[in-house]
Amino acid sequence: MDIITGSMTALITPFKNGKVDLQKYESLIKRQIAQGINAVSPVGTTGESATLSHKEHKECIEVAVATCKNSGVKVLAGAGSNATHEACDIAKFAQEVGADGILSIAPYYNKPTQEGLYQHYKAIANSVELPLMLYNVPGRTGVDLLPETAIRLFDDVKNIYGIKEATGSLERATSLMSARKDFVVVSGDDSVDFPMLASGARGIISVTSNLLPNLKSKLVSSVLEGDYKTSLSIHNDLYELNKTLFCESNPIPIKAAMYLSGLLDSLEFRLPLTNPSAETMQKLEKILIKYEVIK
């Protein structure tokens, strides 16, 4: 099984006049490819998947696959839903169009038991042959995929290979990695990327890399090559930016930052997400000037 690790970007989804701007989406992915990212992950939390139709969800995956074809950059397609059959449908589509793997968030709102989470993920993984990465972010889903459940899935289901751990807990990450040496953990929280990597994580799925893919790629490649000093320096340098990019609910600040830096032509969200406050826009402009992203 060809697993997906390294520097990965949780792609934003651009809108134009209320519709997904697939042309802009393609150009954003091409920029990721040019700046050294290892993989892109379309239609996850940062991609506003919860407010996309199934048709739009699939269109984004298809564009990502087509854009990354023959580039060496892999596509870890978002295939999460709180309805298991819907997640299976998206996963099957991703496989059909040529995605390299599946990233599936824990089902939100339903609050399933650990057995329910186990059966949910087992069903998705068994519906495809692609490698599947679990995704745990209890602060957004209302349910915590516990380490023992994640390891049970890894042991029982051949194509489940790891987890995007977005609790920000180094203890949680260490407990997972110590349980099974081959179980892949990647950081899902920009604020702890270096500590996670230094502790044995095999990569990151980053929000900040939408804006600075070259630096986030360098952060990961450096530590994986044993150059901890360079990686730590980049991580610490990005601290203030990372903090500002999460001053409101993700992906509001990152899309605003991309708009201010000229990467997006319009700043649009779908309700219930709204544009950032004037105060946040001022914070973002100030930090982007400081980091020389804009003048």
Curated annotation (Swiss-Prot):
Keyword Cytoplasm listed: yes
Entry keywords, A to Z: Amino-acid biosynthesis, Cytoplasm, Diaminopimelate biosynthesis, Lyase, Lysine biosynthesis, Schiff base
Residues reported to bind pyruvate: T46, I205
Top EC class, one word: lyase
Main location: cytoplasm
Pfam families xref list: DHDPS
PANTHER family (UniProt xref): 4-HYDROXY-2-OXOGLUTARATE ALDOLASE, MITOCHONDRIAL, DIHYDRODIPICOLINATE SYNTHASE
Protein name: 4-hydroxy-tetrahydrodipicolinate synthase
Organism for this UniProt entry: Aliarcobacter butzleri (strain RM4018)
Primary gene name: dapA
